[in-house]
Structures are given as C-alpha cells and as structure tokens.
Amino acid sequence: MSAQPARSEVAESSSSLRQFWHSGPAGWNRALTRARVLVPFFLAALAVPLVLQYVEDNSSWIGAQYWTLILATCAMYACLAVALNLVVGYAGLLNLGFIAFFGIGSYAYALVASDQIHQHYPLWAAVLVVSIVTLAFALLVGVPALRLRGDYLAIVTLAFGLIMRDVVLELDRPPVLAGHQVGPDGLNITGGTNGIHQVQPFNLPTSLPLLGPVPHYRMYYWIFVGFLALCIYFMLRWRSTRTGRAWVAIRDDELAARAMGVNTFKYRLLAFATSAVMAGIVGMINAAQIFNAFPSPNFDVQTTVMVFIMVILGGLGSLPGAILGAIAFTVPPFLLQQFVFYKYLVISIVLIAVMVFRPEGLLGTVSIRPRKTMGGTLELLTAESAVEASELPAVTDTEVADVEAAAGAIVEDPEWKL
C-alpha cells in the first residue's frame, strides 16, 4: 500500500521538473525568483561556512577558510553582476566604465577609515559618504553621457574609467592646476600605485550568540551574501513597478517608449546612478575586507569585461543568471589552479560552447511579460508572429521620419509625460 503513494510522489516531482524544463527562460527566471526558492537558497548560503568549519573540525581537511574566501569573492562578483545587470540587462545601457564606481567606493571608504587623511568615521557615516560620493560621480558622468546613444555612450563611459584610474595614480602628490601646486608638499591622497593601506574593518561584533567567535573572513562572507540578498530583493520589487517597466521598455525600443510618454533620460539616469551606488558599496565592503584600496583591479577595464561576461553568461536581465554567471566564472579558476597551463583554455572552451549552444545566456534574456489578449488568454511573442509581421507592407523612410517627429512632439508635451 505504501509503494503506490511513493510512486505517485516521484511521478509528480518528475512531472514538475519536466514542466520547469519546458517552461523556457521566462519560466526558469520566474520559478527561481520566487520567495520559496530564494529564501532557502540564501539561508543555505549563510550556513555554508559553518558546514565547512564543522567538516574541518571533524576531519583532516583544512580548507574551510580557503573555500570561504573563494565563496566571498564569488558573492562579491555576484553583487557586481546584479548591479551591472540593472544598467545593462534592464535599461539597456552599455556602461564600460562600471568598475570605476567600484573603485570610487573603495577609495572613498579608505579615505574616511584610515590614517591616509587622518579620518575615522563610524560605519553609518562611512556608508553615507560612499553613497554620496559615488552618486556625485554617477551624476557628473551620467547627465551629459546619457544624452548619447549606442557606441558613443560606451566610449564616454570607457574613457571615464580610464581617466579615473590615471587620477588615482597621480594623486599621491599635490595636484598642479594651471601651473600652480594645490596643497602642501606632503599631500598624498590616494597613495598612487601603492594604494591606501591599513584600512579599518567595519566595527561589528566579533562574537555572536550560539555561534561564538566569528572570524574576519566569515563575517565578510556573510556581509557580501546579505548585501546580495538585499540587492535581489529591491531589484525584484522594482521590476514590477512603473520604473521597472519603463527600464525594460527603454531597453527594448526607446523610440516606442518615448512615444508612450516615458521620460527616457530620467529613467536612464536613475538606472545608471542606482547601479553606480550599488557598485560603490560593494567596493566599500571589499576595502574593509582586505584592509586596502588598490588602483588595480579596482579600476581595470579587464574587471569590467569580466563582470560583463558574468552578466551575459547568465542572461541579460536575469537575476538568478547573474548569480550563476558569477559562480561559473569565479569558482572554476580556483579549481584549475594546479593546471595553470590549461586553465584559460578550459574556460575559453566553456565560454565558446555557451555562446554556440546558449547565445541568450544560461537562463536566457528576460523580456516584458506576456501580453493579455481580448479573450483573456496570454499571448507570447513567438517566431510565428514575427513571420506574420514580416509579411506586412514595408514602412518607408518618410513614414519613419513622420513617426519620429510625432514622438518628439508627444514627449515635449507635459501632459504625456509619466
């Protein structure tokens, strides 16, 4: 009698897995961003260091600290991938200077939490300073740059990242403006190529009830995981709001979004600034974790490219994909360290295979939700509908120009603005 219920449970579970697999990227992302999936995932992630420590205490294995540090690095890159996914995957902006905000946050915290300029702010004040500084730089770059489109925006943001690196390297001595030295002879703001050392960690309890003493490496792993959970929560809340829908509309078709009255500049700037502040806070946590702020890799273009690969690997606009991309691009290099000559070959082969077999990313690109038809059923945009649309009469250049002019007139009308 007991075999039949067990068999039915197995059949139901296999049916659920089959439905999950056939639901496609949209179904995968919806399923993986539900609370009943995310809450156990983050609770399990918080428990991983404790499990590693338990295994180390009860065996001859001694890798708990090493693997916790690897997972902390993975969580840090997952935070950066989620932040970049906001501006690239949601709003469709190609920000090649993204990692510069990570470096700005790192240096901003180091300056107010070290002896470099003899300032030691409390944690809440340091978070406020880092947020304001990164926001100021984001507005300084974003206000003029976001009026550009496509490749021009990418070029401007790339130039910003390169300029910030040079500025950090040169501020180990008093700057010279218009032939005059600004500041005393001994002025050293950023430490140049050496960076800023002896950055104080966060003033947090070193012991917790029921857990006892908490090592430094474990505490910062938990901080990264907690900040990642916070970013995921707010991103999911934003996605279903007017702001989130405006971002996706701008990404998919900016001209159509403008024609519908969306203030595209405002929403593009909001995505750009929010992503920058998130990256700055991640840089702050990193500086407190390693007690230093360095110009490399904090301002390296290679780091931006690596985070871009994580986002594209997981799927544009996919939050679980950003986490999966960070794991897939961070953990394997550590596993292949003993095969140093083959490490990058294996990683390259894996990336090429993903590009060939999953060009939209491991979890696919997230698009606008299915639309509702007059009959009340959900209609998906499929290849068949694209074929039907291709059979319609072609639109001439004159008609396109008329539409653009009409769209500009609508946007200028304040009654049509959101």
Name each model feature, range by range.
Residues 2-418:
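Transmembrane alpha-helices and adjacent helix-loop boundaries
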